[in-house]
Every structure is written in C-alpha cells, then in structure tokens.
A protein has these predicted regions:
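Extracellular carbohydrate-recognition regions
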Residues: 1-11
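Predominantly extracellular/luminal regions of secreted and cell-surface proteins
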Residues: 9-10, 14, 21-50
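A short, local hydrophobic-aromatic micro-motif
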Residues: 5, 30-33, 175, 188
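Coil residues (strongly favoring Ser/Thr
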Residues: 3, 17-19, 54, 59
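Short beta-strand segments of immunoglobulin-like
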Residues: 191-193
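Accessory beta-strand-rich segments of carbohydrate-active enzymes
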Residues: 10-14, 48, 69-189
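Surface-exposed, low-complexity/disordered Ser/Thr/Gly/Pro/Asn-rich loops and linkers
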Residues: 43-66
C-alpha cells in the first residue's frame, strides 16, 4: 500500500455476513465509499459528497452522529513492488484511531489499540508476491461516553463548548500505510545513552 492504492470504506453492520467474503479479490465494492487515507471515516463521507462540509454554518450539528459512532471496514488491494528483492516484507501503519483490527488475505495480523496507534507486521509468509493482495482493517470507535478521557492529551479534540464533537471521534486510518522490504535482521529505533 502506498499513495497509489485506492481504499474503500463501509460500515461493518452493512457488510453483514459478507465480512467473511470481503477478503476475496473478486469481492464487489460498488456500494462502498471511496476512502480518504490518511483521514477519518467522516472525512471520507464528506469528500464523497454524502455529508455537507462541516466547516460551514451549523452543518456539523446536523450530522447523524450515530452513523459514525460505530465500526467500519476499510479495504484495499495491492501488489508487491518488483523492486522488493530482499527476504522480508513488512506492512507499516503510521496511525490508526482508535482501534484497528488488521487482516491480510483473510489472515488476522493483529490489533492496533490506541490513539493514532502505529504498528508494523511481518507479512512475508502471507503475501502473494506475484498477484493481488487484499488488506482489510476493521476500525472501531470506543463505545463509552468518556472515550476521549482515556488520553488526557486527546481530550481537547472535540466535544467542548468551543469545538463541536466530531462524528466517530476521529476514527479511521489517520496516517500513512506502506510496505517495506529488508533482509532477515533489522535494527530500529536505536537509543544510546
């Protein structure tokens, strides 16, 4: 995945039993919304023209927030770059908010749980190096009324009298998603004291 990848988004409740099929490369996406990545679920719906621009008038107050305060699937397909000739292939997430369950080709890679959480997965054994790969992320919004109090630095992101509450609590794939390639050993985040 990189800037050339086309993401789609849809509420989990609307995929119903199809969620078992969405990992197939021939899965129909005609009623899915084009997703903005990096971005939020709500910003994708605004960009698609399904919500009015929240920056004008009282549009933000007219949004049915229950529509966004629920789980959403993000989905894309990608191929491995021909330049990847080293042993290991890594999938990087620079930010998912608030909670994201990551699947590649139907296999669960893991859970990223936190505000703008980052993650890295070794996908070498699961990747289809010669064909299409399906990446799906189930982004979940906290379902309790004090959700933003879990992180004191995040409290002022919305919901006070001076800034309206953002539908979905800014949930989505909020930063870059990309692949990298390495040899069998890597050194990351060295710190010398």
């Amino acid at each position: 995945p990189d800037s050339n990848v086309h993401w789609k988004v849809k509420p989990q409740a609307e995929t119903d039993t199809d969620s078992l099929q969405l990992f197939r490369s021939d899965y129909p996406l005609k009623d899915w919304v084009d997703a903005i990545v990096p971005g939020t679920v709500f910003s994708s719906y605004v960009a698609a023209g399904l919500e009015k621009d929240p920056n004008f008038g009282d549009n933000i107050y007219q949004v049915d927030k229950t529509k966004y305060d629920r789980s959403y699937w993000y989905r894309t397909e990608f191929s491995v770059p021909a330049s990847f000739t080293q042993e290991k292939i890594w999938l990087h997430f620079q930010g998912i908010n608030r909670r994201g369950e990551v699947f590649l080709n139907g296999h669960r890679l893991g859970l990223l749980d936190g505000f703008m959480h980052r993650g890295k997965f070794d996908i070498t054994a699961l990747i289809n190096p010669a064909g299409r790969n399906v990446l799906a992320v189930l982004v979940q919004t906290p379902q309790h009324p004090m959700a933003n109090f879990a992180s004191p630095t995040y409290i002022c992101s919305g919901g006070w009298d001076w800034i309206p509450y953002v539908p979905g609590l800014n949930s989505g794939i909020t930063d870059k998603v990309f692949l990298s390639n390495s040899g069998p050993v890597t050194l990351e985040d060295p710190w010398i004291r």
